Amino acid sequence: LRAADPGDFGGPVEVRGWVKTVRAQKGVSFVELGDGSSVGGLQAVLNPGSEGWGLLADGRVATGASVRVQGELVASPAKGQAVELKASALELLGASPENYPLQKKRHSLEFLRERAHLRPRTNLGGAVARVRSALAFATHEFFHGQGFVGVNTPLISTSDCEGAGEMFQVTTLLPE
């Protein structure tokens, strides 16, 4: 969704993401999609003739559902976004439970800590992921430019989980 801009007009596109909101007005449905790659989502516009319209009509596509939408990017006539997806097909990849806890409102950090598996779907979780990605990329790029070689070292853990391993001593001192 991050790359959706007016330069992509024309030709078919396919996007996948989580449903942030669903609105129905005058025989047209608007589905806002998000995938964490940008702060804003992408609005998909579906007409009653669109494949998958029944999924909206019977309420199976709701906030939190994962979907695949095919269509064409067009200039948005409404304010608030530069482009929208004129959808030709909507496919439900994963339904959301009726008691899906994330809604449009802002949630406290404590609320999100209790639902860590849903944190990446929030604006905050997506922003943190994008910042971490940019920082990791910049760090690697800097050190690569300075002639360093990246090495992924093995991890040494201090815990013996359920007796599955054998403990041993690690020291930085050289034996005499």
In which residue ranges do the predicted regions lie?
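Class II aminoacyl-tRNA synthetase catalytic cores and aaRS-like
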Residues: 1-176
